C-alpha cells in the first residue's frame, strides 16, 4: 500500500527531528511537512533531513494556521495520481511514532477492503515512560466497529494514532477555528466510514508539554467562543443521544472546565466578563444534551477558585443559576457558606495526606 503522512509545522524545532526519524514502515510512504511560517530552526532542520531519510517533502506557507497546513496536504493527495496514496495520516509535530507500531495500522488497513479508518491508542510521556491516555482506555482489543457501535470514538478528537482511507482527503479542516479545527472532519470521517478497525496498542506518543489557549483575557474569550461554536456545530451533526452525550462530556469537562480552571487559577479575581462567559456557556448547554455532573463541576470551579466576589457580580451569577434550576442564597449567606465549604475541602485534603 501507499501511505501519505501529513505533518503541519510551525516553530517546532524542539520536536520535529525526533518525530521524523521515528517514522518507519515496510510500506511505501511519503512524508509531507507543511510549514505555516516558522521563524525558528524548524525549516532548516527539515531541509537537512532528506540527506539522512528518504520520502520527506517540504511545502512552505506564510502565516498559515494548522488547519490550512493540513488542508494543503489533503489537497496534495487529491491532486496527485490516485495510485500514489491508498491512505493518509496526520501527525502532530510534537508527537512521536512508537517503534514498530506504524505497521500495526497499515496491516489492519490492508486486511479488509471495508476498512476506511484504523485507530490505535495514544500515549503521553510521564517522567520518561509512555502511559496510555485515559480517553483511549476503551480500546481493549483489536476489533472492527462503526461509530454507532462505538460512540466512545467521539472522545478522541485528535488526528494522532489514526489512519484514513485516501477517499477522506476530500474532507477539510475548519480554517476559521484555531483550536478545534479538526472536530468536524473527524466526526464526518467516522460517520462515513464503512468499518473502523481498532488496534489495542499505543501507536503515537505525545511529547508536548501542556499548553493552554487561555493565558489572558483575550485568548480566554476567543477560546470559549470557539468551543461554544464547535460544540453546537458537532451536536447538530450527531443523530444518536448517546453520541451527543459522549461528545458533550468531552467538550464540557476537558475543553471547557479544564481551561476554566487553568484561567481562574491564573486570574482568581471574579470579574463581570468571566461570569458572563461562563453564563453564556452554561446557557448554551441547555439547548442540547449534556451530563448533569459537568454542570455542577463548572459551578464548583467558579465558586471554589473565584475570589473577590462583590454583590453585583454575585447577583449576575445567582440569576444565571436560578435560570437553570439551581438555587443560591443571598450574597452574605453565600460568602459565609462558601468560606465553610472551602474550609471543609481544605481539611479533607489535609486528612488525605
Curated annotation (Swiss-Prot):
Biological-process GO terms, alphabetical: cell wall organization; regulation of cell shape; teichoic acid biosynthetic process
Top-level EC class: transferase
EC number: 2.4.-.-
Encoding gene per record: tagX
Superkingdom classification of source: Bacteria
Protein name (record): Putative glycosyltransferase TagX
Similarity-based family: Belongs to the glycosyltransferase 2 family.
Pfam families documented for this protein: Glycos_transf_2
InterPro entries: Glyco_trans_2-like (IPR001173), Glycosyltransf_2 (IPR050834), Nucleotide-diphossugar_trans (IPR029044)
GO molecular function: glycosyltransferase activity
UniProt entry keywords in alphabetical sequence: Cell shape, Cell wall biogenesis/degradation, Glycosyltransferase, Teichoic acid biosynthesis, Transferase
